[in-house]
Amino acid sequence: MAIVKCKPTSAGRRHVVKIVNPELHKGKPYAPLLGIKSKTGGRNNLGRITTRHIGGGHKQHYRVIDFKRNKLDIPAVVERLEYDPNRSANIALVLYKDGERRYILAPKGLSAGDQIQSGINAPIKIGNSLPMRNIPVGSTVHNVELKPGKGGQIARSAGAYVQIIAREGNYVTLRLRSGEMRKVLSECVATIGEVGNSEHMLRVLGKAGANRWRGVRPTVRGTAMNPVDHPHGGGEGRNFGKHPVTPWGVQTKGKKTRHNKRTDKYIVRRRGK
């Protein structure tokens, strides 16, 4: 993994910082595990914008990732690491002993030729997946399930991890990167180690066009709009004289947005700022 700063041959290249990983596969992805990914432009079936700042971008294939890791007690070998345009983490193509291939999230320290395994008897080793009741307290894990059998939902982006800090009865207590501590059933499956490509946060795109390649459209400030378009719009000068709000009038500084009361009892400590 190398961090490369580009030479300032133009204004668009001057600030570019790239993450170069020579271990990544340079050929095409594994075709049977590709899916069609159609663009919406942020619009719903009525043609109305439901998510702003989406549109354009390079055509992409979706890589079908195995978040469930439910091929139990069958050893697999890592064939290669690959780039995935749909996520910040890299992915690994693994070949199981029965001949099936699957994509998984590539943990930090995993490389081509390594062996991995899933199941309750899997050893505590990077890339192995097993129920958290069989993982020692203090271990670092990723791709953590919230419901048994549903597949990993927590800690899937580049550099993400969760620490198991306690085990009581049928539950384990996890400490998330945000500072939140929550309980999860010990039957839920997690993968040992942290997600790789943690240098992703250091990259600098360098120009607006690089964001457009990724399908991200510009974000216009509310104060630069007219009163019809945003609560902050209009007026002479830059002051809007009220608390900052979203375009729909909802407070935007510190207002709590969580509404899932049903699972509040599993949160031991809320995330910090």
From Swiss-Prot:
A biological process from GO: cytoplasmic translation
PROSITE patterns registered for this protein in UniProt: RIBOSOMAL_L2
Keyword terms of this UniProt record: Ribonucleoprotein, Ribosomal protein, RNA-binding, rRNA-binding
Biased segments, Basic residues type: 253-263
Pfam families, A to Z: Ribosomal_L2, Ribosomal_L2_C
Subunit and interaction comment: Part of the 50S ribosomal subunit. Forms a bridge to the 30S subunit in the 70S ribosome.
Protein name in UniProt: Large ribosomal subunit protein uL2
Source organism: Histophilus somni (strain 129Pt) (Haemophilus somnus)
Lineage: Bacteria, Pseudomonadati, Pseudomonadota, Gammaproteobacteria, Pasteurellales
